[in-house]
Amino acid sequence: MFNLLDNYKDVNDIKKMSLDEKKQLALEIREFLIENVSKTGGHLASNLGVVELTLSLFSIFDLNHDKLIWDVGHQAYVHKLLTGRKDKFHTLRQFGGISGFPKKCESVYDFFETGHSSTSISAALGMARARDLKGEKHNVVAVIGDGALTGGMALEALNDVGYRKTKLIIILNDNQMSIGKNVGGVSRYLNKLRVDPKYNKFKEEVESTLKKIPNIGKGMAKYLERLKNGIKKMVVSGMFFEDIGIKYLGPIDGHNIKDLTEVMTAAKKVNNPVIIHVITKKGKGYEFAEKNPGKFHGIGPFNCNNGEIAATSTNTYSKVFGDEMVNLAREDKKIVVITAAMRDGTGLQNFAKEFPERFFDVGIAEQHAVTLAGGMAVEGLKPVFAVYSTFLQRSYDQLLHDICIQKLPVVFAVDRAGIVGDDGETHQGIFDLSYLTEMPNMTVMSPKCMAELTHMLKWALNQNCPIAIRYPRGGDNVYLTPLEDFEFGRWEYILNKGKIALVAQGRMVEHAVLAAEKLEQMGILVRVISACFIKPLDKVMLKKLIEEDVTIITIEDNIIRGGLGSYILEYVNTLHRKVDVINLGFKDEFVRHGKPSILYKLYGLDTGSIVDKVLKVVKLSGIF
């Protein structure tokens, strides 16, 4: 079925293939990806778009010496197939299986681990400068998408690349989402000339000869250079790169292996930084993904025959958030919403459609988004920044310096807080409590159910301070009655009997309630408290628990260090009272990829583990 792919054993095997064989291999890879990702889920559209690009990179560069870095990394599936992981592909993004991103522990050819965007050029530049300092001669290549190129970090790196003129090859994978491609005969002609090494050599010889002519030589050379640059600026979008000192080659058809290998061969001969602008199509070769690349960007299991996704719950925290923002915006014209290239992921499609003038998608620019919100707040608007937990951490300084110091009323809708599952270490939202609670003037909240999120948003938008509301991926698993009225820093009793209190936040309240029900069947009563405010703590309730000699077990989907439990312990220590406080949460480590249910059990946060912990406390303390 996959004749060429099945017989592919070494990273350099492709160098022995004819052009026709490479084209056949591309077809086999697409078929393999569609078949396998339909079962495991994953990032399909972006990988279908880089098949020929990846084959060309492996054809021209020798990964036993050269270095290849994939920005974000979710488009590295073809790379994984060609570096010995085909037989493990059925475990993609599964617990104990291969990651959906480059991982150094998986392969010596995964030279730098990625997951967040816009990092590849910086990493590649660092590796290139290390190469030069060590006197080595290999190539370093960074592959970055047009979306990731909007990130400030990528632009900072480009500025540095051009200034120092370090030899580096950058592949701009433009899937027509952000950067417009050049069209027209003149553009194609100039590109053909600039790619041809003979043209570059001829141009250098002409310039050298002209400069030797007395009186007019240097002037003529400068005139021709100005004329050439003037023409380029009119027809070639790559002049931005040229102007900052990076040679631009392109645009190139990213699905034409012959053209790709020719331009990459030419780029290898340039001793300065080069950027190759490649045009690709997301979802290439799979009709359903080509028509709807957004749907197939990150997708769960689906029917590969018709592109239909396996049935899932339609109601999620993200959808509830998006719908509520529309409702609130209809009532209050001061409400504005900001997102950083995550409109659909954060559930804001309808808001963007109904209030386009009050919706701001700033691209992959979380730092800018936070301070933009601050500026809006200063002028009396009510900004809401919707962002995944894992990406909010990119704007730490702006949160602290631009928002909290001034105590600006910005609401941060922190989506995907806690375990997100299959994307693994780079995307788990388990650090936000630790850095948000340490910021003066920041209030941190967490709803126990989707309905409670709607009331929390309405309340937060009428406060005069920065507020972060963190909520998980997916929807409710247990029905819980929402709290509708909030008092600053006050928690809620769900159950109020027993000498052990389960103090939980967010989704962990579900786990605590289910654990309490099981314990009650065993004759053990426990209290369940929803810590809807992580900061400030409900010190009144805590003092009462301590006075009643109640053992406190905190449950959070955050790392323990710096989280809810740590915050409670810090407060309890100020009271100089003997009290047992047990913290359940994630250890001081990165959480691997896997289904949330598996990860909760692994870290002792599932219902059964909570029951076991309570039983252990009961046995040791003799409370009952």
From Swiss-Prot:
Pathway: Metabolic intermediate biosynthesis; 1-deoxy-D-xylulose 5-phosphate biosynthesis; 1-deoxy-D-xylulose 5-phosphate from D-glyceraldehyde 3-phosphate and pyruvate: step 1/1. Binds 1 Mg(2+) ion per subunit. Binds 1 thiamine pyrophosphate per subunit. Mg(2+) binds at residues 146, 175. Its EC number is 2.2.1.7. InterPro entries: Dxylulose-5-P_synthase (IPR005477), THDP-binding (IPR029061), Transketo_C/PFOR_II (IPR009014), Transketolase-like_Pyr-bd (IPR005475), Transketolase_C (IPR033248), Transketolase_CS (IPR049557). One of its GO terms (cellular component) is cytosol. GO terms for molecular function: 1-deoxy-D-xylulose-5-phosphate synthase activity; magnesium ion binding; thiamine pyrophosphate binding. It catalyses: D-glyceraldehyde 3-phosphate + pyruvate + H(+) = 1-deoxy-D-xylulose 5-phosphate + CO2. Keywords: Isoprene biosynthesis, Magnesium, Metal-binding, Thiamine biosynthesis, Thiamine pyrophosphate, Transferase. Gene3D superfamilies: 3.40.50.920, 3.40.50.970. It holds the Pfam family DXP_synthase_N. One of its GO terms (biological process) is 1-deoxy-D-xylulose 5-phosphate biosynthetic process. Its cofactor is Mg(2+); thiamine diphosphate. Thiamine diphosphate binds at residues 74, 115-117, 147-148, 175, 286, 366. It comes from the Bacteria. Homodimer. Catalyzes the acyloin condensation reaction between C atoms 2 and 3 of pyruvate and glyceraldehyde 3-phosphate to yield 1-deoxy-D-xylulose-5-phosphate (DXP). Belongs to the transketolase family. DXPS subfamily. HAMAP family: DXP_synth (MF_00315). PANTHER family: 1-D-DEOXYXYLULOSE 5-PHOSPHATE SYNTHASE-RELATED (PTHR43322), 1-DEOXY-D-XYLULOSE-5-PHOSPHATE SYNTHASE, CHLOROPLASTIC (PTHR43322:SF5). This is 1-deoxy-D-xylulose-5-phosphate synthase. It comes from Clostridium kluyveri (strain ATCC 8527 / DSM 555 / NBRC 12016 / NCIMB 10680 / K1).
